[in-house]
Each structure stands twice: as C-alpha cells, then as structure tokens.
C-alpha cells in the first residue's frame, strides 16, 4: 500500500556451530524490524503472520548508564503484554483468529555489547562468570525479570544470553542455544 512501511522480506542464513569437533549447520529464516515505537505493532503482526517460533529480543546497556532511558523496557513490556494476553494488533478477521492460537516456542532475551558492559567493567566476579549460567544474575537483566516471569507463567519458555555482535562473542552459541531450546 502506498504510504505504508513495507516489511522487509525474511532472509535465510546458515548457522554453523562446532561442538566437540562436530560441526552443526542449521538454516534459519530471520527478519530484522526497526526498534522505533511506531514499529512495535508491526513486530507483533509479523510474528503472528509468519508464525515465528523463536523471538529474540535484543537489549544493550543503555538502561544501566541512564536510569531514565526506559525505551528498551517499554518495548519489552509491550511485547510481553501481547504474548501473555494473546492480544495482537491484527488487521483482518482471519489474522485475528490465527493470533488467538499463536504463541512462540521460545523467547530469548539477548544482552548485546557485552564487550562494553561486562568485559570493560572493573567487576572481576562477572568476568569470571562470562561462560557460566551465573551470568544470568547480572544486573543488566534486573528490569526485565518481572516480564520474563510473566512469560514463564504463561507457558512461554525463555532464556537469557549475553553476546557482543561487534566482536563475535557468543553469537553462534546463542543462536544454537535458541534452536536447541525451542525443541
């Protein structure tokens, strides 16, 4: 339609991950939509229309630097509210009916820029916990914990991971974990 933002087409990507000398290769289909407020309803419509199995919600450390910066948290709560209530902003009757049954198999909260908020920090405890499950207790996730609990109570499993896309830290491992956990 003229004057409306058109969603980008989904793209296919190959994910390679080596585990104990065994290389696993999976093909995934992904779409990246903008993070501005006026795109939020489009996120939800896109998830339902494409029947997305894994939702990866990417955050960074902005809310730790500036406590008044709550844009990420508002976007997160918007998505969580819709997933828990199954109330999606669909346009057609058919899509509204489809949305009542929609639920993702996995919700992944991924904290990006770990090279900035974790590895450059003076807190040696968290640097030691980089490759452990204890990193899930880091304060970067604190504002998002109530929403993750709501998802869990609604029957939507979720995981928390830390990556640095710029440096390539744990990106493949995180995608592989998502693919493994959704089963």
Regions inferred by a protein language model and the residue ranges of each:
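Conserved GTPase G-domain signal focused on the G5
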Residues: 161-183
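Conserved C-terminal guanine-recognition region of P-loop GTPase G domains, centered on the G4
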Residues: 47-49, 54-153
């Amino acid at each position: 339609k003229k004057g409306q933002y058109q969603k980008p087409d989904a793209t296919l990507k190959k994910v390679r991950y080596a585990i104990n000398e065994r290389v696993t290769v999976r093909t995934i289909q992904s779409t990246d939509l903008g993070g501005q407020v006026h795109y939020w309803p489009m996120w939800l419509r896109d998830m339902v229309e494409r029947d997305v199995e894994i939702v990866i919600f990417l955050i960074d450390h902005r809310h730790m630097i500036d406590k008044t910066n709550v844009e990420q948290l508002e976007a997160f709560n918007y998505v969580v509210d819709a997933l828990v209530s199954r109330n999606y902003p669909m346009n057609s009757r058919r899509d509204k009916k489809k949305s009542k049954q929609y639920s993702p198999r996995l919700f992944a909260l991924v904290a990006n820029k770990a090279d900035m908020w974790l590895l450059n920090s003076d807190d040696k405890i968290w640097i030691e916990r980089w490759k452990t499950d204890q990193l899930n207790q880091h304060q970067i996730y604190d504002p998002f914990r109530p929403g993750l609990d709501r998802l869990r109570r609604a029957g939507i499993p979720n995981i928390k991971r830390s990556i640095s896309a710029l440096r390539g830290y744990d990106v493949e491992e995180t995608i592989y974990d998502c693919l493994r956990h959704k089963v």
